[in-house]
Structure formats: structure tokens, C-alpha cells
Amino acid sequence: MLILASASPRRQDLLRAAGIPFEVEPTDVPEIPQPGEHPNASAERLAHEKAAFIARQRPNDLVLGADTIVVVNGEMLAKPADPRDAARMLRLLSGRPHQVITGVCLIGSEARTENRELRTFEDIRSETTTVFMDSLRDADIHSYVATGEPMDKAGAYAIQGMASRWIPRIEGDYSNVVGLPVALVYRMLRKHGAES
């Protein structure tokens, strides 16, 4: 059974829509980038920490961890700490292309073909999507932050929500911007014989 090491309703919706069966086991791993860490490395490390935390509790299951980071002008944006932080992030993103990076980690066991012995594997990857956001007026930012929608999202916006009106185009995987690169996850599951 695939265990999603995340309480994110968006990740759950994406897996459900793709027809991938799973159970949810949320983690309390702090999502803190390390100083000087490359954004992809940070997203991959945090995804690994989440998956490893649950894998220790459920060693016979396949565990999927993920972490999403937004990068603009070299600054990594995680989830906003408060409404003021959300407004600050939206001002940074306003009128600028930025990258959404999701690190994904799959931990489990698979049989070796020659002797059917089980071995543990860790498959860690990341996906990057470029998002183009229109320029936002202060009134747009304040009214959007007041809805509460930005508060639990990396970069303080939801492409699948009200912020979609400010995003004319993206380059890359849409589901990655929502929070989980589904095609990448499916390829990883298939590689390890666990796609069904």
C-alpha cells in the first residue's frame, strides 16, 4: 500500500484524480530550508525527511514524501508565517516569472530478480515548473490574503484557486505547481513495480 506522508488535501486530490490508491499518514517534520542550500536539494531533502519519518513507523509499506518550494530572484519561499508574510511573498512574485520545485521521495522494498530477496530503496527526485504571474495591485494582494487561501501554500498562492486569474501561463507540469508532480510520481511507482 502507498502511504502519503502529507496532510495536504491538494496532494491527496491529485493522487485520487490519477487513480493511484493510497493512505494518508501526516508528518510533523519542520519544513525549514538550510542556509546556502540549493532549492532542488532543499525540496528533495525535506521530501526525504518526511518519507523516512513514516517509513520508520511503517517499514513494510511504500511511503511517498513531498515538499514544494517557490523560488523567485534566488529567494526560496515556503509557506507564509502570517498574513504579512503572505503579502510580502505576493509582492515578490508580482510581475515576475518564478520556479515551483517539488521534491519527491519514495521509500520501500522491492524483490531482486535473481534471488527474490527484498531490498530497501530510496528514490529521490524533483520537478521544476516555471510560472508567469501578472503584476498585482496592492488591493489585489490585500483582498487575496484576506481570503486565507495563501496561508498554507508555498509561495502564498494556489494556482488552482483564486490566484489562477493572475497566471497567464506556465512552462512545465501543472500538477507540480499544485503540490505533486503526478506524472513523475507514477514513473517512480512504475520503476519499482508499484503502480497499481
Language-model-detected regions and their locations in the chain:
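Flexible, glycine-rich phosphate/dinucleotide-binding loops
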Residues: 11, 31-33, 113
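Short loop/helix-cap segments at secondary-structure boundaries that form the rim of catalytic
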Residues: 13-17, 34, 56-57
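A structural micro-motif
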Residues: 20-22, 61
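N-terminal beta1-alpha1 ligand-phosphate binding loop
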Residues: 1-20
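Anionic-ligand binding patches
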Residues: 2-3, 36-196
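N-terminal functional modules and adjacent low-complexity/disordered segments of proteins
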Residues: 9, 24, 113-116
